[in-house]
């Protein structure tokens, strides 16, 4: 099964490591530094388009990780994941 993150971006539900709220996740300097490093390395995907991202989804990708910004709120993504059978988030 897949979870739709917005703007035609889909991820496999079993690859999701976590869904984080961008409002609270960026309070920590350590988190901001990590996100900056990921973005500078070109590993950040923007599914939010021109809208302000509301959530960050981290997925496993082979031996690495995939970081995706979404314009959908974490609550919406969680509701969608549960309706598709992703109960462990």
What do the PLM-derived regions correspond to, one by one?
Residues 1-89:
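Eukaryotic intrinsically disordered, low-complexity regulatory linkers and tails enriched in Ser/Thr/Pro
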């Amino acid at each position: 099964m897949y979870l739709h993150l917005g703007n035609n971006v889909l991820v496999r539900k079993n690859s999701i490591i976590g869904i984080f709220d961008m409002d609270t996740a960026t309070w920590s300097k350590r988190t901001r530094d990590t996100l900056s490093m990921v973005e500078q390395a070109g590993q950040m995907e923007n599914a939010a388009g021109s809208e302000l991202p509301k959530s960050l989804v981290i997925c496993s990708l082979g031996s690495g990780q995939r970081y995706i910004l979404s314009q959908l709120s974490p609550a919406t993504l969680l509701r969608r994941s549960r309706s598709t059978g992703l109960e462990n988030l």
